[in-house]
Structure formats: structure tokens, C-alpha cells
Regions:
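Membrane-interfacial hairpin junctions
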Residues: 258-259
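Structured catalytic core of nucleotide-sugar glycosyltransferases
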Residues: 1-133, 137-138, 143, 162-167, ...
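Aromatic- and Lys/Arg-enriched surface recognition patch
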Residues: 255
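Conserved catalytic loops of nucleotide-sugar-dependent glycosyltransferases that act on lipid-linked
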Residues: 75-84, 100, 104-105, 126-251
């Protein structure tokens, strides 16, 4: 990371060609009044539509846009990991590309950082999603909050603000589904974690990437977070435990797919 840029916005993208133009316009409107140097990093996670072509076109229309492209879909953790590595800012904002996260919330996230937080997570207090997404998410958030010891309402919100050092320390944990637990991991590492309510909008284009298989992933995530909590103070143990867990998880997923 390079301190010449103050703010980096990292946005994973998967098949969001229609959302990208209005998203860039909203980002410009939110970021320009801040009067700070910024960059927008789109990570195309193996899109099969014209998302990357749209990003390339937009990079000629807007200043500060950078793009990373995966040849296949590696999922959100990998997209965030490469985004964190590429980010040059002192502050990193993450958000989704589907227009459900509102860029106008970015100044409020920065204000919360100025109050002394190292990571600020958005809370989709009034969520515009079907029950098939909201009910599992509520259960996940409650159990994760109890297990981790950090009282957040919404671990899953993509809209977050990080100080640079939090991103650097989070990189070893950005694989699988562990990106969901970055607030908890930051909390265990001694960083101050805060939360603010943020606007959440209905999806305008495309379709949700949420599927029934993610219900299984949710239960497996709970197992993972239990291992993380137990072994956070003994880093060498966590990799062996998570390795065993990954083998078990892989077996379950294969069995699930075969059904």
C-alpha cells in the first residue's frame, strides 16, 4: 500500500454489468466532496457477462479507477484479498457492486473512524432482501456475536471501513468464507471495531448470488468461527485445525453436491 492515496474503495464484481455505470456516478458524488485523494479498485471475480468491458470503459470516463480481473470465479474472499493487496490508501472501504450498498454512507464511516475506531462495519438495519436471505443472516449474526464476544448486528454487511493496518493483518484470513468474520478477527487482534446503521436498497439489476447451498455454508462457517475463537491465541495451531476442518468441509460439500 502507498500512503500517497488516502482512500481506497475495493469492490468485488461478479456479473454486475448493469449496476456498474450508476455505481460509479454515485461513488463520484460521494467521494469528490471529501477533497482527498482516492482510488476505486474493481475486482472482476470471473464475470461471464460484460462487467470487465464496462469497467474498462468507465476507467476512461472517471479518474482513479483501477481494475483487477480473475479468469474464473474465486469468490469474495479472494477478491477482497487481492483488493487489499492492491490498495494504496491509508483507509480502505469495501462495498458490493450491486447498488444495494449506498456510497453516500462513506463519509459517515470515515467519521466513525475519526472517533477512534480501526474498523467500522455497516448495519443494514432496514434490509431489502427476501426472507430466504434475511432469516439465515439473522441467525448467523446472533450466533457469531455470541461466539466471538463482539456485539455487532450485521457481520455480513459488505460496506465497511478499515485502517490500512487492519487490512494487512487480515490478509492471512482471507480465504474460504472467513471474510465474514473480519470484524471479529480484528477485535481479537486488539483493534477497535464499531458499527453504524446504513441504508440498504433493493436490487435494481441482475439477481442475487445467494443460493440454497449457502445455507450449508452458513452452518460450516459457524464451525469455522468456533475453531478461530479457540485457537486465536495460538496461531500455529489454527492452520492445522482449519486444515482438518477444510478437509471435513470439502467432504460435506462433495456429499451435498452429489445428492
Amino acid at each position: 500500500m502507498n500512503s500517497e492515496i488516502y482512500l481506497s474503495v475495493v469492490i468485488p464484481v461478479f456479473n454486475e454489468e448493469e449496476s456498474l455505470p450508476p455505481l460509479c456516478a454515485k461513488l463520484r458524488d460521494a467521494l469528490e466532496p471529501l477533497q482527498c485523494s482516492y482510488e476505486i479498485i474493481f475486482v472482476d471475480d470471473g464475470s461471464t457477462d460484460q462487467s470487465f468491458a464496462v469497467i474498462e470503459r468507465l476507467s476512461g470516463e472517471y479518474e482513479g479507477i483501477r481494475a483487477v480481473r480473475f479468469r474464473r470465479n474465486y469468490r469474495k474472499a479472494a477478491a477482497l484479498a487481492i483488493g487489499f493487496k492492491e490498495a494504496r490508501g491509508e483507509i480502505v472501504i469495501t462495498m458490493d457492486a450491486d447498488l444495494q450498498d449506498d456510497p453516500s454512507e462513506i463519509p459517515r464511516l470515515l467519521e466513525k473512524l475519526d472517533e477512534g475506531c480501526d474498523l467500522v462495519s455497516g448495519w443494514k438495519k432496514k434490509r431489502h432482501d427476501p426472507l430466504s436471505k434475511t432469516l439465515p443472516s439473522r441467525l448467523f449474526n446472533k450466533v457469531t456475536s455470541m461466539v466471538s464476544g463482539i456485539r455487532l448486528h450485521d457481520f455480513n454487511c459488505g460496506l465497511k471501513a478499515y485502517r490500512r493496518e487492519v487490512c494487512e493483518d487480515a490478509l492471512p484470513y482471507l480465504y474460504g468464507e472467513l471474510y465474514r468474520f473480519l470484524p471479529a478477527i480484528a477485535h481479537w487482534a486488539g483493534y477497535r471495531v464499531g458499527e453504524i446503521p446504513v441504508q440498504h436498497h433493493p436490487r435494481q439489476f441482475g439477481y442475487s448470488k445467494f443460493g440454497t447451498k449457502r445455507l450449508l455454508n452458513g452452518f460450516l462457517d459457524l464451525m469455522t468461527i468456533t475453531f478461530v475463537v479457540r485457537f486465536m491465541t495460538t496461531p500455529m495451531h489454527i492452520f492445522g485445525s482449519l486444515g482438518l476442518l477444510s478437509t471435513f468441509v470439502g467432504s460435506l460439500v462433495c456429499a451435498y453436491i452429489a445428492l
